[in-house]
C-alpha cells in the first residue's frame, strides 16, 4: 500500500471512529416497564434446562441496563461469571424481526440456541421461518442490529 493510501485510510478511520463509538455505547433492550428482561425468565435455564423457566426475584442480577431473574443461586452465579454467554442476542428482541429490520416482541417458548447464542423469536412459526435460512437470517440480523441501535438505541 502506498504511503498516500495509508494516510488516507488512517484519516477515514479516524473520522469514522466517533460514529462507531456512539453506536457501541448505545443500548437497545426488550424490557418490561420495570426493567426486567426476557419477561422474567431465567436466561441460564435456556441453556441448562433446554426450556424457559421463570426466574425468582430473590435471585436477580442487574446487568448492562437490564434486570435478570434466575431460578436458582447456581444459575445466578453462572450468569455473573459469564453474562455474555447467557444474555439474549439483539437485546432480547425477535431475531427474525431484527433480520427484517424490525423490533418485535417475543414468545419465550420460541427460543433457540444457535452457535451458543440465545435467540428469541416472536412465535414457533416465525422460528420455523427463520430456520429456513438460519445463517442468512442471522447475518441479516447482525447487519441490521447496528442500524437499529443507532436509530432507536439510548
Regions found by a protein language model. Name each.
Residues 1-3:
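N-terminal secretory signal peptides that target proteins for export/translocation
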Residues 6-15:
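Sec-dependent N-terminal signal peptides
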Residues 22-154:
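Charged, low-complexity intrinsically disordered segments
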Residues 15-21:
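C-terminal segment of classical bacterial N-terminal signal peptides
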Amino acid at each position: 500500500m502506498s504511503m498516500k493510501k495509508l494516510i488516507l485510510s488512517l484519516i477515514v478511520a479516524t473520522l469514522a471512529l466517533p460514529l462507531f463509538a456512539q453506536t457501541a455505547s448505545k443500548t437497545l433492550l426488550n424490557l418490561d416497564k420495570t426493567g426486567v428482561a426476557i419477561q422474567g425468565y431465567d436466561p441460564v435455564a435456556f441453556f441448562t434446562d433446554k426450556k424457559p423457566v421463570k426466574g425468582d426475584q430473590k435471585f436477580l442480577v442487574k446487568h448492562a441496563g437490564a434486570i435478570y431473574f434466575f431460578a436458582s443461586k447456581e444459575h445466578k452465579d453462572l450468569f455473573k461469571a459469564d453474562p455474555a454467554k447467557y444474555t439474549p442476542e439483539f437485546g432480547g428482541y425477535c431475531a427474525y424481526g431484527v433480520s427484517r429490520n424490525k423490533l418485535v416482541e417475543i414468545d419465550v417458548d420460541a427460543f433457540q440456541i444457535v452457535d451458543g447464542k440465545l435467540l428469541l423469536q416472536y412465535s414457533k412459526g416465525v422460528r420455523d421461518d427463520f430456520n429456513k435460512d438460519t445463517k442468512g437470517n442471522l447475518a441479516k440480523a447482525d447487519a441490521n442490529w447496528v442500524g437499529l441501535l443507532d436509530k432507536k438505541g439510548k
